[in-house]
Amino acid sequence: MKAEIIAVGTEILTGQIVNTNAQFLSEKLAEIGVDVYFQTAVGDNEVRLLSLLEIASQRSSLVILTGGLGPTEDDLTKQTLAKFLGKALVFDPQAQEKLDIFFTLRPDYARTPNNERQAQIVEGAIPLPNETGLAVGGKLEVDGVTYVVLPGPPSELKPMVLNQLLPKLMTGSKLYSRVLRFFGIGESQLVTILADLIDNQIDPTLAPYAKTGEVTLRLSTKASSQEEANQALDILENQILDCQTFEGISLRDFCYGYGEETSLASIVVEELKRQGKTIAAAESLTAGLFQATVANFSGVSSIFKGGFVTYSLEEKSRMLDIPAKNLEEHGVVSEFTAQKMAEQARSKTQSDFGISLTGVAGPDSLEGHPVGTVFIGLAQDQGTEVIKVNIGGRSRADVRHIAVMHAFNLVRKALLSD
């Protein structure tokens, strides 16, 4: 089924309101296996709406119109659709009864002929009751095309879609999706590696999305059950993860988790809890961002003992007992400093892990290091590891955010290697 969404309302075209209905509808239609091919907005103009309906009827099998069902003169969606289909408007008894009750309970409200229009539907349409408003929606099939009219206010449209429309559109298959999350590889490289799978996809499909510091892949398939979907998605997932980078590294090494809400931080926090281990942090350029991210999760007192924000050389020396002369010799942005910060954070809090971050967030370079240079240390029983990452060409906020992601990834790898 090819679906098309037409938003009716001059206020959308003038930017007075944002068309959030289209996003909501597209998402919900996709969940039941209905593909949306077109989204259009048109003003409150009969001629232009008639023209758009003519186009939509030729290219789509499901045409959904939102907005223009109210009591004002410029609310003309149902009237225009009826004219296009050569049908009359008729009253829906249930919607009329709701109008009667509404005005009976509000004797001070003037009931005008325009109010009555809210209870009308196109002749032959199945009414879609409005749970939170007065304008009734409708669903009608003519010449192989299904037309749907929905109210514009999201508070009225959403329950009508969820409770009235979707059950009437349900087919034997639904859309099932799985999200793979990758860190440490860019979108362009990932897309190049997966070019054959992307270019030749039919069902299941995969779509890459770049976010700050990471890339996600959405795998989707139409199936009649979750079990059937899992079989198809498992095959595609393994095909993806079996691929290698140009350096011969498996994509499995970059895939850290699944789902829309999953993050490197959530993975690390849950794994620390599972293993019963603790962590402390010493931060310079990130100024406590790693620790604040840990604290976003409930129940972290069992795994997070505390930490240090040591922005200046003097505070690194005073709070972490690192000799100032050593810091001056090696520089605050150095492998040495990251190592000592991590080791001292671990030692002073008696934690299983000590993580440190020091570097150049920008906009100016520091100690000869360009913006985006970051050293991250991880101290544990087996010793201390320090990595250097270069996060160039980013804003100050992005450098700090991505540096914290690298820190969580370093801890994640250590936890998985135990």
UniProtKB/Swiss-Prot annotation:
Expression is induced as follows: By competence and damage.
SMART domains given for it?
MoCF_biosynth
- Which SUPFAM superfamilies does this entry report, sorted A to Z? CinA-like, Molybdenum cofactor biosynthesis proteins
> Which is an annotated Pfam family here?
CinA_KH
Entry's InterPro entries?
CinA (IPR050101), CinA-like_C (IPR036653), CinA_C (IPR008136), CinA_KH (IPR041424), Competence-induced_CinA (IPR008135), MoaB/Mog-like_dom_sf (IPR036425), MoaB/Mog_dom (IPR001453)
Q: Do you know which HAMAP family this protein is assigned to?
A: CinA_B (MF_00226_B)
User: Into which family does the record put it?
Assistant: Belongs to the CinA family.
Name the chain's protein. Putative competence-damage inducible protein
